[in-house]
């Protein structure tokens, strides 16, 4: 039951982040991007500047390498840049502290992220 609840909370958090980001960025495309294996939970594409930002949304409070595995997958990055322009940001939105890793991946606290949209 705990795993199911965690799954539901994770999906709800994804939906809230996606919806609020869409509302805050009416001139940009905001969507999930599916691949044969895996997905980016959110892409914010700026067609006017041919750039995009890619995100993973996690319900966890902890940082873990598997959370950003898609954000460092060269094939996914190449395909995304081909379709939506240069990737300017790779971020994991989660419930822990803000941090930037050595590989450039950013961790953003979900509450801070949502407040920044206002």
Regions found by a protein language model. Name each.
Residues 1-118:
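A cross-kingdom feature that marks ATP-driven nucleic-acid transaction machinery
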């Amino acid at each position: 039951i705990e795993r199911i609840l965690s799954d539901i909370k994770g999906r709800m958090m994804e939906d809230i982040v996606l919806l609020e980001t869409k509302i805050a960025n009416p001139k940009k495309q905001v969507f999930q991007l599916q691949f044969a294996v895996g997905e980016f939970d959110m892409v914010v594409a700026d067609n006017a500047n041919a750039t995009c930002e890619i995100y993973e949304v996690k319900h966890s409070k902890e940082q873990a390498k598997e959370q950003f595995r898609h954000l460092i997958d060269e094939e996914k990055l190449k395909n995304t840049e081909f379709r939506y322009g240069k990737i300017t940001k790779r971020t994991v939105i989660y419930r822990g502290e803000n941090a930037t890793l050595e590989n450039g991946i950013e961790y953003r606290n979900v509450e801070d992220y949502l407040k920044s949209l206002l």
